[in-house]
Amino acid sequence: GEGHEYEGPSFHDCGMHYVDISRWYAGCEYKTWHAQAIRMWDYPEPWWLQCHGTFENGVVFDITQGHVYGQLSKDQTHNSYIDVIGTKGIARMSHDFKTAVVELRGVNETHRIEKPYGGKNISTLCDLFADSVRTGVFNSRLPLMRDSAIASEYAWKFLDNARRNEMPSIGN
Protein backbone atom coordinates (compact mmCIF):
# COMPACT_ATOMS: atom_id res chain seq x y z
CA GLY A 1 0.00 0.00 0.00
CA GLU A 2 0.85 3.63 -0.07
CA GLY A 3 2.61 5.38 2.80
CA HIS A 4 4.74 4.09 5.63
CA GLU A 5 2.22 2.00 7.56
CA TYR A 6 4.65 -0.76 8.61
CA GLU A 7 7.33 1.57 9.96
CA GLY A 8 4.90 4.20 11.19
CA PRO A 9 4.10 7.60 9.71
CA SER A 10 6.69 9.30 7.52
CA PHE A 11 8.01 11.42 10.40
CA HIS A 12 8.70 8.27 12.40
CA ASP A 13 10.06 6.15 9.56
CA CYS A 14 12.18 8.88 7.92
CA GLY A 15 12.10 11.74 10.42
CA MET A 16 13.54 9.71 13.29
CA HIS A 17 16.90 9.80 11.47
CA TYR A 18 16.87 13.61 11.71
CA VAL A 19 15.85 13.35 15.37
CA ASP A 20 18.83 11.02 15.94
CA ILE A 21 21.33 13.20 14.02
CA SER A 22 20.19 16.37 15.82
CA ARG A 23 20.65 14.71 19.21
CA TRP A 24 24.09 13.45 18.14
CA TYR A 25 25.19 16.92 16.98
CA ALA A 26 23.93 18.54 20.20
CA GLY A 27 25.49 15.85 22.39
CA CYS A 28 22.58 16.14 24.76
CA GLU A 29 18.98 15.08 25.43
CA TYR A 30 15.87 16.91 24.18
CA LYS A 31 14.26 19.28 26.70
CA THR A 32 11.45 21.27 25.00
CA TRP A 33 9.67 21.08 21.64
CA HIS A 34 6.77 22.35 19.58
CA ALA A 35 5.64 20.56 16.43
CA GLN A 36 3.29 21.46 13.60
CA ALA A 37 2.27 19.20 10.72
CA ILE A 38 0.21 19.19 7.54
CA ARG A 39 -1.70 16.32 6.01
CA MET A 40 -2.15 16.22 2.24
CA TRP A 41 -5.19 15.08 0.26
CA ASP A 42 -6.90 13.75 3.43
CA TYR A 43 -4.19 11.15 3.99
CA PRO A 44 -4.44 10.20 7.71
CA GLU A 45 -0.78 10.91 8.55
CA PRO A 46 1.18 14.13 7.94
CA TRP A 47 3.31 14.53 4.83
CA TRP A 48 5.20 17.45 6.39
CA LEU A 49 6.24 18.03 10.00
CA GLN A 50 8.32 20.81 11.51
CA CYS A 51 9.55 20.61 15.09
CA HIS A 52 11.73 23.07 16.96
CA GLY A 53 12.87 23.29 20.55
CA THR A 54 15.83 23.05 22.88
CA PHE A 55 18.23 20.50 24.29
CA GLU A 56 19.12 20.30 27.99
CA ASN A 57 22.39 22.14 27.26
CA GLY A 58 20.55 25.12 25.71
CA VAL A 59 21.30 24.22 22.10
CA VAL A 60 18.32 24.96 19.81
CA PHE A 61 17.07 22.61 17.09
CA ASP A 62 14.81 22.86 14.05
CA ILE A 63 13.84 19.69 12.21
CA THR A 64 11.72 19.83 9.07
CA GLN A 65 10.86 16.60 7.30
CA GLY A 66 8.46 16.29 4.44
CA HIS A 67 7.73 15.06 1.01
CA VAL A 68 5.58 18.03 0.00
CA TYR A 69 7.87 20.92 -0.87
CA GLY A 70 6.01 21.79 -4.04
CA GLN A 71 5.15 18.12 -4.50
CA LEU A 72 3.70 18.71 -7.95
CA SER A 73 5.89 21.68 -8.92
CA LYS A 74 8.20 21.43 -11.92
CA ASP A 75 11.35 22.21 -9.87
CA GLN A 76 11.21 21.03 -6.27
CA THR A 77 13.29 22.48 -3.45
CA HIS A 78 14.78 20.50 -0.56
CA ASN A 79 12.65 17.87 1.14
CA SER A 80 14.12 17.65 4.64
CA TYR A 81 16.62 19.46 6.81
CA ILE A 82 17.90 19.93 10.35
CA ASP A 83 19.50 22.92 12.03
CA VAL A 84 21.27 22.52 15.36
CA ILE A 85 22.05 26.02 16.64
CA GLY A 86 24.47 26.92 19.41
CA THR A 87 26.12 30.15 20.53
CA LYS A 88 29.31 29.33 18.62
CA GLY A 89 27.88 27.98 15.42
CA ILE A 90 25.38 25.92 13.54
CA ALA A 91 25.31 22.41 12.11
CA ARG A 92 22.93 22.08 9.17
CA MET A 93 22.06 19.05 7.07
CA SER A 94 19.72 18.95 4.09
CA HIS A 95 19.07 16.85 1.03
CA ASP A 96 16.84 16.76 -2.03
CA PHE A 97 17.18 13.01 -2.69
CA LYS A 98 19.94 13.85 -5.20
CA THR A 99 22.51 15.73 -3.14
CA ALA A 100 23.18 15.68 0.61
CA VAL A 101 24.73 18.81 2.11
CA VAL A 102 26.27 19.20 5.57
CA GLU A 103 27.29 22.68 6.69
CA LEU A 104 29.28 23.25 9.86
CA ARG A 105 29.60 26.97 10.61
CA GLY A 106 31.75 27.75 13.63
CA VAL A 107 33.45 30.80 15.09
CA ASN A 108 36.73 30.17 13.25
CA GLU A 109 35.86 27.75 10.47
CA THR A 110 33.12 26.93 8.01
CA HIS A 111 32.85 23.59 6.26
CA ARG A 112 30.41 22.71 3.50
CA ILE A 113 30.38 19.06 2.46
CA GLU A 114 28.31 18.06 -0.55
CA LYS A 115 27.95 14.45 -1.65
CA PRO A 116 25.58 12.43 -3.79
CA TYR A 117 22.57 11.38 -1.74
CA GLY A 118 23.09 7.75 -0.84
CA GLY A 119 19.95 6.72 0.97
CA LYS A 120 20.49 4.93 4.24
CA ASN A 121 23.88 3.39 3.37
CA ILE A 122 22.69 -0.07 4.36
CA SER A 123 25.65 -1.75 2.64
CA THR A 124 28.10 0.28 4.76
CA LEU A 125 26.22 -0.61 7.95
CA CYS A 126 26.21 -4.30 6.98
CA ASP A 127 29.96 -4.24 6.27
CA LEU A 128 30.74 -2.55 9.60
CA PHE A 129 28.49 -4.99 11.45
CA ALA A 130 30.05 -7.99 9.68
CA ASP A 131 33.55 -6.75 10.59
CA SER A 132 32.48 -6.37 14.22
CA VAL A 133 31.09 -9.91 14.30
CA ARG A 134 34.17 -11.32 12.56
CA THR A 135 36.66 -9.56 14.88
CA GLY A 136 34.56 -9.69 18.05
CA VAL A 137 35.22 -5.96 18.54
CA PHE A 138 32.42 -3.38 18.39
CA ASN A 139 33.11 -0.81 15.68
CA SER A 140 32.56 2.66 17.14
CA ARG A 141 31.27 3.84 13.74
CA LEU A 142 28.16 1.70 14.25
CA PRO A 143 25.10 3.33 15.81
CA LEU A 144 23.98 2.10 19.21
CA MET A 145 20.60 0.40 19.61
CA ARG A 146 19.93 2.72 22.54
CA ASP A 147 20.26 5.76 20.27
CA SER A 148 17.79 4.27 17.79
CA ALA A 149 15.29 3.59 20.57
CA ILE A 150 15.65 7.16 21.87
CA ALA A 151 15.24 8.61 18.36
CA SER A 152 12.14 6.49 17.81
CA GLU A 153 10.67 7.57 21.15
CA TYR A 154 11.19 11.28 20.44
CA ALA A 155 9.93 11.01 16.85
CA TRP A 156 6.66 9.63 18.28
CA LYS A 157 6.57 12.41 20.92
CA PHE A 158 7.07 15.09 18.26
CA LEU A 159 4.39 13.51 16.06
CA ASP A 160 1.96 13.35 19.01
CA ASN A 161 2.70 17.02 19.78
CA ALA A 162 1.89 17.95 16.17
CA ARG A 163 -1.41 16.07 16.44
CA ARG A 164 -2.33 18.11 19.52
CA ASN A 165 -1.54 21.32 17.61
CA GLU A 166 -4.02 20.59 14.80
CA MET A 167 -2.97 18.97 11.53
CA PRO A 168 -4.89 20.60 8.70
CA SER A 169 -5.47 18.67 5.51
CA ILE A 170 -4.76 20.54 2.28
CA GLY A 171 -4.81 19.66 -1.39
CA ASN A 172 -7.47 18.48 -3.78
Regions found by a protein language model. Give the residues of each.
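A structural signal for well-ordered alpha-helical segments within the folded catalytic domains
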Residues: 9-12, 16-23, 120-127, 146-153
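Short amphipathic alpha-helical segments at helix-loop
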Residues: 2-7, 110, 114, 137-140
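C-terminal helix-rich "cap/oligomerization" subdomain common to oxidoreductases
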Residues: 56, 128-172
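NAD(P)-dinucleotide binding in Rossmann-like oxidoreductases
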Residues: 39-46, 54-127, 141
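Short, charged helix-to-loop "capping" segments that act as catalytic/coupling loops
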Residues: 27-29, 68-77, 136-144, 161-162
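Predominantly a Rossmann-like dinucleotide-binding segment in NAD(P)-dependent oxidoreductases
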Residues: 1-42
